[in-house]
Amino acid sequence: CMKELAGIDQVATIPDFEDAGYETAQAVLEESAKFNEGVVAPLNWSGDQDHGSWDNGVVRASKGFKEAYAALAEGGWQGLGQPLEYGGQGLPKIIGAACVEQTMAANLSFSLCSILTGGAIEALLTAGSDELKTRYIPNMVSGKWTGTMNLTEPQAGSDLALVRSKAVKQDDGTYRISGQKIFITYG
């Protein structure tokens, strides 16, 4: 599939991806499958039985999720397609996307943490200052920090055209955030 549909051998002709041909893609996908089968998939059923909760102001993930995410990050899976200069492995996004697909198939609820963190990294790479990139991306790639999704507001649901929350830059370079969110995915 990586050869025929993804054209991985053509991707390997792009500068900086020369070592990311079919053999590399196959090896990475095989290791990803082992990780997901051995670590992530077993948490699917147990996560449904002992789901996450909000207890006295503290978010508690399903048993095993924290340890599994630490293993995911330590194994380099969070940084697979992220730039080398921020601690990533610099592999083509197509290889990273295939690995994310395996994680999603193994346990969709667990995979959201990695997916949302990847989305936050992508937002920083696209629109963040060099200072923000240097501060946040290495911590997200390493698994020390994660990303969330904060869209839903009481008056808007998830209709982004109707959200009212604002981030106003302050003189000291920080942002003052005002508004109300009613759901924070992986918060």
Predicted features, each with a name:
Residues Q89, E131-G187:
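Glycine-rich, Trp-frequent "lid" loop and neighboring beta-strands that shape
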Residues G7-I8, A105, E122-D130, S142, ...:
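Short, well-ordered loop/turn and helix-capping segments at boundaries between secondary-structure elements
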Residues L112-D130, G157:
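N-terminal glycine-rich flavin-associated loop
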Residues S53, T117-I121, S142, E153-Q155:
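A glycine-rich phosphate-binding loop feature that marks nucleotide/adenosyl-phosphate handling sites
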